[in-house]
């Protein structure tokens, strides 16, 4: 019954799938700016996904909202932590403040157009019948645990307090990325054990074991194909040096980017186009950040040669690399969001592709207008 108690206040706001989608996305965006998307997925998902399910939002639509607002918009902009702008700026010979202050319209056009396109393209399927199975699970859990009022109240109070303590801890100790994810994940495991003890008493070890088994089985069943597909792309990245030697240090994917850079005409608009393409190519390794030194260096080269804005060119490359690999397009970059929403990462990537392409087109047009 703890999830039912937690849902009560939010149910007054989350009345329709459309409103729920925007509220979930904006919440994910704000958390991702301060904590980065990976820990925010676990933090926001653990609290808000049950609310979204109860409001009628499909798991796939919820995953899209969290992924596009978090791993796309917030991570590519990164105005608070400034990890991505710092890498791009260092390679481009400018400051991170230059990118954020001069190219902010490009970031907002990319993020705004992408999430709006995603909403408009999927608004009719946000509350489909696919949700019924998840909704039934929640309802059964509610009805079976309503008798444990004390346990439900204790757990309902412990969950938000524990995750709030995580936020304070991450901000105080400057934890982000994998470290922050570990803090949130560890808290979730402790809460699961605490809830099992309160709800099932002596049977709690068996329940915890079953929950862990179900989680591992789900991960293996859903993400095993991702490992195989990802292996072929990783062979094209820098990791190929461990197999074929140092002579292949750049990797096949980076070779494509370098070749395109060498054959790009000296025109600000063509340079902007290839900056975007090269950023997307470097993002295919599933990292997003690995291509930022290359796109930053090319922004400096192209900007100097064509008298174009280096921050705008660097922002374009950064947007392409992170939206593709950070990620919203590459399936193995979607694993955290797909896992928390119980959806296929490949299906999520397929749904993300049209709005991201629309957003990239809009960002390119905005950049060209700024280069005039």
Predicted regions and their residues:
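Membrane-embedded alpha-helical segments and adjacent helix-loop junctions characteristic
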Residues: 1-55, 202-302
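Alpha-helical transmembrane segments of multi-pass membrane proteins
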Residues: 18-32, 57-74, 99-104, 108, ...
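Alpha-helical transmembrane segments in multi-pass membrane proteins
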Residues: 20, 24-28, 106, 110, ...
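Alpha-helical transmembrane segments
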Residues: 54-64, 198-208, 308-312, 329-351
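Inter-helical loop and helix-membrane interface segments of multi-pass membrane transporters/permeases
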Residues: 84-98, 131-145, 169-178, 245-259
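Juxtamembrane and boundary regions of transmembrane helices in multi-pass small-molecule transporters
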Residues: 88, 92-147, 320-372
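Long, contiguous bundles of hydrophobic transmembrane helices that form the permeation core
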Residues: 101-214, 372
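Selective recognition of specific alpha-helical transmembrane segments in multi-pass small-molecule
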Residues: 158-169, 220-235, 361-362
């Amino acid at each position: 019954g703890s999830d039912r108690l937690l849902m009560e206040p939010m149910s007054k706001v989350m009345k329709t799938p459309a409103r729920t989608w925007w509220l979930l996305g904006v919440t994910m965006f704000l958390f991702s700016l301060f904590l980065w998307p990976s820990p925010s997925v676990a933090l926001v998902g653990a609290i808000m996904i049950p609310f979204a399910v109860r409001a009628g939002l499909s798991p796939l639509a919820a995953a899209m909202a969290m992924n596009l607002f978090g791993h796309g918009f917030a991570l590519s902009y990164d105005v608070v932590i400034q990890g991505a702008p710092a890498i791009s700026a260092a390679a481009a010979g400018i400051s991170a403040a230059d990118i954020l202050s001069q190219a902010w319209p490009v970031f907002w056009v990319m993020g705004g157009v992408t999430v709006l396109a995603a909403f408009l393209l999927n608004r009719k399927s946000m509350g489909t019948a696919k949700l019924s199975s998840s909704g039934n699970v929640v309802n059964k859990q509610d009805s079976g645990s309503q008798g444990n009022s004390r346990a439900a109240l204790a757990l309902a109070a412990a969950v938000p307090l524990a995750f709030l303590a995580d936020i304070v801890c991450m901000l105080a100790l400057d934890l982000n990325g994998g470290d922050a994810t570990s803090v949130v994940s560890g808290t979730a495991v402790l809460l699961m054990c605490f809830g099992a003890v309160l709800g099932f008493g002596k049977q709690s070890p068996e329940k915890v074991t079953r929950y862990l088994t179900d989680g591992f089985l789900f991960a293996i069943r859903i993400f095993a194909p991702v490992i195989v597909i990802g292996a072929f792309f990783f062979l094209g990245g820098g990791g190929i040096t461990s197999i074929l030697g140092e002579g292949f240090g750049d990797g096949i994917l980076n070779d494509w980017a370098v070749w395109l850079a060498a054959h790009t005409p000296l025109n600000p608009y063509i340079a902007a186009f290839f900056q975007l393409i090269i950023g997307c190519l470097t993002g295919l390794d599933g990292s997003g950040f690995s291509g930022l030194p290359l796109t930053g260096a090319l922004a400096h080269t192209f900007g100097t040669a064509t008298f174009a804005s280096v921050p705008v060119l660097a922002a374009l490359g950064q947007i392409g690399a992170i939206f593709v690999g950070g990620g919203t397009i590459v399936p193995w970059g979607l694993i955290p969001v797909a896992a928390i929403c119980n959806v296929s990462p490949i299906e999520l990537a397929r749904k993300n592709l049209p709005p991201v392409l629309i957003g990239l087109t809009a960002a390119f047009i905005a950049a060209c207008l700024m280069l005039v």
